[in-house]
């Protein structure tokens, strides 16, 4: 637990948690943009990872995403979270169309202490190296529109965000999966694509998408 760590290790964990949370936030915005969940005019372009990235500029959506990331960052810092899920849902029949899964593993603290320098800045692995790995994944997410099924023009879509946490973690009621949205997509018409992963000296993050095709 963070309370038992040395001050330098706490700084390293805080820095790594921010890197992971930032990736989740920009990946979420990229998915919402690429999949047309919100109009393109709702997004603005910013520079991140030496890439032009999009973020939703609508006040209510931005507030919602910021609240999500604030809670997620706490769970990552506490090593209480193992998965971050984004589900794209049809508003017409409430069917889950796509399921984006981000797996997060916290490395063994002894291994981290041996390999890291504890400067809280991505530790032993350089920030440039981490960003290079993230750039690769972001490009893969962007290019995924070339094979993901086109969402139907005569339907509207929304998204749900879910997390997998430690069983003993206190989870706010709004995070509870009451509709079963977090379940894995099943059926003969489901495909899955795994992207490359990235890591800091503390966290390992994997990304994949499951989708239904005609």
Curated annotation (Swiss-Prot):
Signal peptide: none
Single biological process term from Gene Ontology: biological process involved in interaction with host
Subcellular location(s) of the protein: Nucleus
Top-rank taxon: Eukaryota
Record carries keyword Transport: no
Keywords: Cell cycle, Cell division, Mitosis, Nucleus, Virulence
InterPro entries in the cross-refs: HORMA_dom, HORMA_dom_sf, Mad2-like
Cellular compartments per GO CC: cytoplasm; kinetochore; mitotic checkpoint complex, CDC20-MAD2 subcomplex; nuclear periphery; nucleoplasm
Gene3D superfamilies: HORMA domain
Reported function: Central component of the spindle assembly checkpoint which is a feedback control that prevents cells with incompletely assembled spindles from leaving mitosis. Plays a key role in virulence, probably through cell cycle checkpoint functions, especially those monitoring the integrity of DNA and chromosome segregation, which might be required for the pathogen to repair damage caused by host defense.
Family statement: Belongs to the MAD2 family.
Subunit and partners: Component of the mitotic checkpoint complex (MCC).
Protein name listed in UniProt: Spindle assembly checkpoint component MAD2
Organism: Candida albicans (strain SC5314 / ATCC MYA-2876) (Yeast)
